[in-house]
């Protein structure tokens, strides 16, 4: 990992926009493959798999397959509370070509997992996620194989996952939005509104709520960048630039 801090420069604000756009584009030395198709989901412990929508949530998939009623109609909110106490699994398969396998490195990128998720690639555990607000980037070059690759995600019930913390705490935190008598919402890095609010129902869900990609590249890649405005006038903006680069070549 190399940190490169660019020299302070004076540039027009328009150039900053161009740099941001270029950062998201591919070139001859890299390839980005979106893995949002071909997903299936299942209630853990069963062998019944159904097509899933990614990005999405398990409630969304259950509604589509008519396994739960519309939770926003009447008192149907009460009929869907069982979902939050179950574990759920998602899986898909994707193909790796000889050209992709020859790349110097590959990264599996999850922009958002909600919330307690074990990620497996070809049977190997790669990640145990516990925060829906952050993305995860996983090096997967050594796990990839030519042809079909299997990606499997096991989502743990956010209720059962945090209940031990609640039970050992000895008291209820004042989370008035939480529509349950046991306020386990305070123990999760998860959107509080899913546990209920004065304007919304309780629907504690799980799922792949943001896109999934696999990124192939040669030599190096920009993993992060930060632009800080130092000063601003009507004529010029003075900026400092910092790049974080993954460099896999020998130093």
Where are these regions (language model features)?
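Accessory beta-strand-rich segments of carbohydrate-active enzymes
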Residues: 26-27, 31, 42, 85-221, ...
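Bacterial N-terminal signal peptides
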Residues: 12-20
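N-terminal, polar/Ser/Thr-rich
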Residues: 46-51, 55-70, 184, 200-204, ...
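Short, solvent-exposed loop/linker segments at the N-terminal edge
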Residues: 229-237
């Amino acid at each position: 990992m190399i940190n490169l801090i660019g020299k302070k420069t004076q540039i027009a604000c328009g150039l900053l926009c161009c740099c941001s756009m270029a950062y998201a584009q591919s070139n001859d030395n890299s390839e980005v493959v979106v893995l949002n198709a071909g997903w299936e989901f299942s209630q853990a412990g069963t062998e019944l798999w159904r097509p899933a929508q990614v990005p999405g949530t398990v409630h969304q998939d259950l509604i589509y397959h008519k396994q739960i009623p519309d939770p926003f109609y009447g008192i149907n909110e009460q009929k869907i509370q069982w979902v939050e106490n179950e574990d759920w699994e998602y899986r898909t398969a994707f193909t790796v070509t000889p050209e992709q396998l020859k790349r110097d490195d590959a990264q599996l990128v999850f922009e958002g997992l909600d919330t307690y998720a074990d990620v497996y690639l070809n049977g190997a555990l790669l990640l145990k996620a516990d925060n829906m607000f952050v993305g995860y980037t996983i090096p997967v070059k050594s796990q990839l194989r030519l042809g079909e690759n299997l990606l499997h995600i096991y989502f743990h019930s956010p209720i059962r996952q945090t209940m031990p913390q609640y039970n050992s705490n000895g008291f209820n935190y004042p989370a008035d939005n939480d529509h349950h008598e046991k306020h386990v919402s305070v123990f999760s890095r998860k959107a509080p509104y899913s546990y209920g609010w004065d304007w919304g129902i309780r629907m504690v869900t799980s799922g792949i709520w943001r896109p999934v990609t696999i990124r192939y590249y040669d030599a190096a890649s920009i993993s992060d960048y930060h632009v800080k405005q130092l000063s601003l006038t009507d004529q010029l903006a003075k900026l400092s630039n910092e790049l974080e680069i993954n460099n896999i070549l020998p130093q």
